[in-house]
Amino acid sequence: ATVYNQDGTQVNVGGRVEVAL
């Protein structure tokens, strides 16, 4: 389950924020 933010980053269930390439 990954939630994508409007700025193109993604917040994983663990709380880590990653940049969607």
From Swiss-Prot:
GO cellular component entries = cell outer membrane; pore complex
Q: Domain of life, per the record?
A: Bacteria
Q: Does Protein transport show up as a keyword for this record?
A: no
Tell me where in or outside the cell this protein is found. Answer: Cell outer membrane
Give a GO molecular function annotation for the protein: porin activity
GO BP term, pick one? monoatomic ion transport
- Membrane topology annotation: Multi-pass membrane protein
Keywords (alphabetical) are: Cell outer membrane, Disulfide bond, Ion transport, Membrane, Porin, Transmembrane, Transmembrane beta strand, Transport
| Major location (coarse) | membrane
Q: How does it assemble?
A: Disulfide bond interactions within and between MOMP molecules and other components form high molecular-weight oligomers.
Described purpose of this protein according to its UniProt entry: Structural rigidity of the outer membrane of elementary bodies and porin forming, permitting diffusion of solutes through the intracellular reticulate body membrane.
Give the similarity note.
Belongs to the Gram-negative porin family.
From the Swiss-Prot or TrEMBL record, give the protein name: Major outer membrane protein
